[in-house]
Amino acid sequence: MLREYKTVREIVGPLMLVEKVEGVKYNELVEIETGTGEIRRGQVLEVNGDKALVQLFEGSTGLNINDCKVRFVGKSIELGVSIDMLGRVFDGLGRPRDKGPMIIPEKRLDINGNPINPTARDYPSEFIQTGISAIDGLNTLVRGQKLPIFSGSGLPHAQLAAQIARQAKVLGSDSKFAVVFAAMGITFEEADYFISDFRRTGAIDRSVLFINLANDPAIERIATPRMALTCAEFLAYEKEMHVLVIMTDMTNYCEALREVSAARKEVPGRRGYPGYLYTDLATIYERAGRIKGRKGSITQIPILTMPEDDKTHPIPDLTGYITEGQIILSRDLYRKGIYPPIDVLPSLSRLKDKGIGQGKTREDHADLMNQLFASYARGKQAKELAVILGEAALSDTDKLYAKFADEFEARYVAQREDEDRSIEETLAIGWDLLTILPRAELKRVRDEYIDKYLPEKGE
């Protein structure tokens, strides 16, 4: 039997303190009935004796401590999941936002999930083709990996996220592929862009969207990624699908976490973020992976905007510790008109070696990748030298490397927003670029691969 309390002592920001409670549990779902009969939801953050601290998902605007009725439901927050969620748009708490009917759930799952037993985890493998050369060719995404994108304010990470969601696929697999898209704290224009882009391209049919707008309560953002991951776990482990989870913008999520921490008067950590930020982010990122004996998998691409483009900021810093690499967007490339402005040199996919090579992409992929990295790095050095000493100071070989760097950015990194390159096209562009350099400079590629794949100059 549900007990109803009218003993609300205090409301501060998104938090409510309820007194004289019994049998209340941490993370328990709470229903708050206002004086007008409106029902709002919350979650127990802390229990101390007969007092419970409740986090309000819809905010505290309009609440009066004298006429609130609080009910503790006896279970944690759950999401009703079903295969019918594919093709639908929900808000940050899993309620339909697309004016469609409510989902009839096949089952209800706790949004906090269950940790995967480390011994039951299967090592990430298998190449995921995103259709973007700078990722597929140089910083390969592998099924079961968590690979974040570090962006900056004003950079086209929204377009990149939509493009990956449209184009991503596992080659040669008979399992179905799905995309779960979680957006936190985005503007109405961004939400409209995502929804219309998914519908226009038909990507909506294999996608589930959870959208928390900037004018929605900030506290709702804490639940949004967990709603998305709960849906992803159902599709992956119950329906045997390969699921790609794209979460944007994790910076907004962390700001919401800081807001709740400040309201609780907790001792702040770096830059005012709570000391448990690392642990909290890990509860989200570590829900990616594969399980032995299961066909399905969850691959994550969290996207975050680095405040002031600072890689040492706590959010990108801690994210980098938990995840398996990072894709970094460059403001300099963006100013040159290059899309996507992926800076390939500081970017890294730690598991790329597990998803490339014979039987996965192509035998020459690893050698070609190493040669492109080395040549582009030397080309950038040559261009920097030319700025200081003048182009006349460069050797003929350095001039070729400088030309290679420009061509690499213009032809390999840059591509249209609607351009879906196969891995064969990406590798072909890479080999074509290497014709700019003398064969003697191709020291990182085996001779048999050069003979087999390097086109003749002038072809």
From Swiss-Prot:
Gene3D superfamilies: 3.40.50.12240. Belongs to the ATPase alpha/beta chains family. CDD domains: ATP-synt_V_A-type_beta_C (cd18112), ATP-synt_V_A-type_beta_N (cd18118), V_A-ATPase_B (cd01135). This is V-type ATP synthase beta chain. It comes from the Bacteria. The gene is atpB. GO terms for biological process: proton motive force-driven plasma membrane ATP synthesis. The keyword Iron does not apply. Produces ATP from ADP in the presence of a proton gradient across the membrane. The V-type beta chain is a regulatory subunit. The lineage of its organism: Bacteria, Bacillati, Bacillota, Clostridia, Thermoanaerobacterales.
